[in-house]
From Swiss-Prot:
InterPro entries: Ribosomal_bL32, Ribosomal_bL32_plant/cyanobact, Ribosomal_zn-bd. Pfam families: Ribosomal_L32p. HAMAP family: Ribosomal_bL32 (MF_00340). It is found in: Plastid, Chloroplast. Belongs to the bacterial ribosomal protein bL32 family. One of its GO terms (cellular component) is large ribosomal subunit. It comes from Phalaenopsis aphrodite subsp. formosana (Moth orchid). Its main location: plastid. This is Large ribosomal subunit protein bL32c. It comes from the Eukaryota.
Length: 57
């Protein structure tokens, strides 16, 4: 099994963690933006099937 020879520096650890967090926050912003456009009906890339409501006589 591969074992690292030296300890990873704290600055490198922080840089990697910040990149990981930034990637997650960008994905969250993108998902929220898509949800907003779908809910307002302004989405051009998503088609939401509308259900027809049948009235009973």
């Amino acid at each position: 099994m591969a074992v690292p020879k030296k300890r990873t520096s704290m600055s490198k650890k922080h840089i990697r963690r910040n990149l990981w967090k930034k990637k997650g926050s960008l994905a969250a912003v993108k998902a929220f933006s898509l949800a907003q456009s779908i809910s307002t009906g302004q989405s051009k890339s998503f088609f939401v099937a509308q259900k027809k409501v049948l009235e009973k006589s």
